[in-house]
Design a protein with these regions (language model features):
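Beta-strand-rich, repetitive solenoid scaffolds
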Residues: 45-49, 63-67, 75-79, 102-104, ...
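Secretory/extracellular carbohydrate-interaction modules
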Residues: 1-73
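Ligand-recognition surfaces built from glycine- and aromatic
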Residues: 126-161
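Short tryptophan-centered beta-strand motifs in secreted/extracellular beta-sheet-rich domains
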Residues: 30-32, 96-107, 112-114
Length: 161
């Protein structure tokens, strides 16, 4: 994804169809490998969310990773009915360096485990959305420069028992 060279230019992308949900009889996995060229001058949300045309403007339901302009820190977020649990400083983006971001919803335990580069960084037990969601990405530049987010892969798997 390459932004135009104006502050807050970028894109809001969502996979067609709300195909993934958190239910007690299923497990859910989301993962991606990406790199950002200027980590502290961009905004990103990546994960699962309900249909929304401005994810960074405040979405109602989702499970995602977030980083905002002015910092390269990564937050883990679960959000249900516009109420969120957010853990800041779960990790840090480094310019032009690939990073793996993954989360796993355990339907039996009812929690979401967040991983960065294979290491568990947070577990959320509250504000887990109970609605169907879609793979979602919102990426913006935070300066008058055409910044990029290079996504190597994204995968999302829901497994019933």
């Amino acid at each position: 994804i390459t932004c135009a060279a104006d502050e807050n230019d970028g894109g809001n992308y969502q996979l067609n169809g709300e195909s993934f949900e958190t239910t007690s009889d299923q497990d859910l996995y989301f993962g991606t490998k990406l790199a950002i060229n200027d980590a502290d001058q961009t905004d990103i949300i990546i994960g699962l969310a309900v249909t929304d045309t401005t994810l960074l403007g405040g979405l109602a339901d989702g499970i995602y990773f977030e980083s905002v302009d002015g910092a390269a820190t990564i937050s883990t977020v679960t959000e249900a009915s516009s109420s969120e649990t957010q853990n800041d400083s779960a990790g840090t983006f480094v310019d032009d360096t690939e990073i793996e971001l993954e989360f796993y919803y355990d339907g039996t335990a009812g929690n979401v485990e967040f991983y960065i580069d294979g290491s568990l960084v947070n577990t959320h037990t509250t504000t887990i959305p109970a609605t169907q969601m879609r793979v979602s990405i919102h990426f913006l530049t935070g300066e008058a420069v055409a910044n990029t987010c290079t996504i190597d892969w994204i995968r999302c798997i829901q497994i019933g028992r």
